[in-house]
Amino acid sequence: IDYAFLDRTLQATRDSGQKLAFRVMCCSTTRNHPYHPKWLKEIGGRELQTRYQGQGPLSVPDLDDPAVLEKHLDFIKRLGAKYDGHPDIEHVDLGSVGWWGEWHMSGSTGAKMPTPDTQKKIVDAYLDAFKKTPLLMLIGGGPMLKHAAEHGTGWRADCLGDMGGFSKTWCHMRMAYPKMLPEAGALDAWKTAPVAWETCWDMRKWVNEGWSLRFIFNYALALHGSY
């Protein structure tokens, strides 16, 4: 772990009067810029070759490989030992798995999501490592979000504001969030943990598309968004 980098980032955050939220990412979609360390392969850790939306080849770690999983669980443990309860950290996004740590491998050819057993071990590692700093998890995590929420995490959702920007027949606001959150039993998570929204595009796009700003903002507030 590059503690010096994190400490510099926390210092800059503190100097600006803010707090830091961050997520660990293992799978990069940028060719020749992997997120995992070079030494992983040298110790016998297995890498997978894949493509993202036809682009690649891309090298990603196989979290189901015992050598890779052991190192990653140890990484999470040491991260928590150093930073759990740090006064300048607002929350930690429970990531690691999938593209950008967002719990999916959509558009991938050659790499799948880790097994449910591996996913649960990673979630449990975060739960064990961070007892003081709040955790939240992307709502696309499916059963893992349910498991995490049952143990006190909050949730984060991508694409607040999407009323049809990707498809004429599907959107996040009306079809994704109303299904994912009840299935995970996470609708009351806001009472004890953070809820974070990440927008798709910005208000200029929303206005240009004719989408109601009032509806979007009221939607975010109705689900008790913290950020």
Each model region followed by its residue ranges:
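Aromatic-lined substrate-binding rim segments of carbohydrate-active enzymes
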Residues: 1-53, 113-134
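Catalytic-core regions of glycoside hydrolase
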Residues: 14, 91-227
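Feature targets compositionally biased, intrinsically disordered low-complexity regions
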Residues: 43-44, 53-55, 79, 84, ...
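Soluble or luminal CAZymes and related metallo-dependent hydrolases
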Residues: 2-5, 64-75, 114-118, 208, ...
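Active-site groove signature of glycoside hydrolases
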Residues: 48-112
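Charged/polar, solvent-exposed surface patches and flexible loops
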Residues: 8, 74, 81, 128, ...
